[in-house]
Structure formats: structure tokens, C-alpha cells
Amino acid sequence: MTGRLLLAGSLAAFIAGSAAAQDVTYEVDGESFEGYFAAAEESRGLVLIVHDWDGLDDYERRRADMVAELGFDAFAVDVYGAGNRPETMEARIAATRTVLGDAERMQALMLGGLEEARRHSAAADVVVMGYCFGGTVTLAMARTGEIEDSVGYASFHGNFPDGPAWPSDTAPLLIMHGGVDQNPSMSDLAEFVEEAEEAGLTYDVEIYAGANHAFTVFGGGRYQERADTRSWATFGRFLEARFGS
């Protein structure tokens, strides 16, 4: 198992493309959305991926393929709407505020995406994960306690949203954070840890030296291969533990 994880976690050796992957158009409350499903050869669980602030694109598709390579079905959920892929900073900020500013709608979009994912995967248990904005949505959904059969939540350089009190049965959380990230900052992370301790949550935090925000974004100006590789390996171990493999 260790050898397989190391191979899958090595981004340099990774060959993108799931053997069974497809874009999926679906509806939530009469509105069209476009997700992406990547099937594992012999799935041991389902991973729901929440996209970054620019919407679902090839980055999330690649990550979904990587999850499938680890042996888990992956569904990249769309919370912006089909065709809504903002290109400017202003448009991206507006899109994230629209989603995060309406908790009821955000929850409906996430549950609708999960419902669609379950049409494609027979796996019962689910881990929710996301990048940046997607990590924030992931933790916001963890606070609601509304994801049925959730066994874990993982956030890559996401923020820590306010919300209702943490449910007592919240599944384990995995937080991966850049050491020089200012959005969220180390102070924000410390506040989350204090809150998590008070709520009695099960959580793990990894901090990567010298890594800035968006350290996992391939080709981006803040990409750090060391932090990306280490965080992906940690996430792989998290999946193995949460799905009992």
C-alpha cells in the first residue's frame, strides 16, 4: 500500500486521465450545473471535490483523476452554474461572495451535487475536499452536519468560515496550510484550532514551510512542489484511514 501511495502521490510521475471520466450536466432547483466524475477501477469510497474561486475547470478534473488513481470515485461539484467560469479577479470575488453569502443556497447546491455524484458511484461513504474557496465551502458544509455518510473533510489552503456550532459528531477534519499564507493567516488558523478544541473536534493540521496561498495550483506563481507533493500524500493517507482501507 505504501508503494502505491508514493507512486500516486508523486506528481512528477503522475499521468493524468481516468480510465472512466466524464463531464456531467445536472440540475439543482431547475438550474443547470456541470460537474466531472472520475471512476476508480475498484472504488473504496467517494470523494466530493469543491472547486477553487475560478469555477470548475481542468485543475479540478485533474485532481479528480488523481483521486480515481488512488482507488476512490471522485465527483467535482459545480457551485457556480454551467458556463459560469469567472475570469477576472472582480468576477471571482463576486462569485464566491454570492455562494458564501447565502448559506441555504450553498447547502442546496452541495447536496444537489452529492445527489448527482451518487447516481454515478455506488460508494456509500464520502469525503468532502476543496481548494481555497472550495476548502472554505468544505468546512462550511462540515459545520452544517448535512452531508449524509460523511467520513471526513479536507481543506487545502481554505479559509475558516463562521457558522453554526460544530455538530458533536463532525467527521475528522484535515487542514493543509501554507506557512506564509496570509489568506487565511496563521492567526486565523490559530483561532480555528482554538475553536476546534473547544468543540471537541477530531482534526489534523499540516503547515508547509515557505508555502503561500494556492501552493497546490500547478503552474501558478505560488505553486510549491514540495508542499503540493507532501499535502497530496497526506491526503492519500487520510482517505485510506477514513475509508478503512
Locate the predicted segments by residue.
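Acidic catalytic loop of the alpha/beta-hydrolase fold
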Residues: 180-184
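Serine-hydrolase catalytic machinery in alpha/beta-hydrolase-like enzymes
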Residues: 23-121, 217-219
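Short beta-strand/loop motif that positions the catalytic acidic residue
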Residues: 175-177
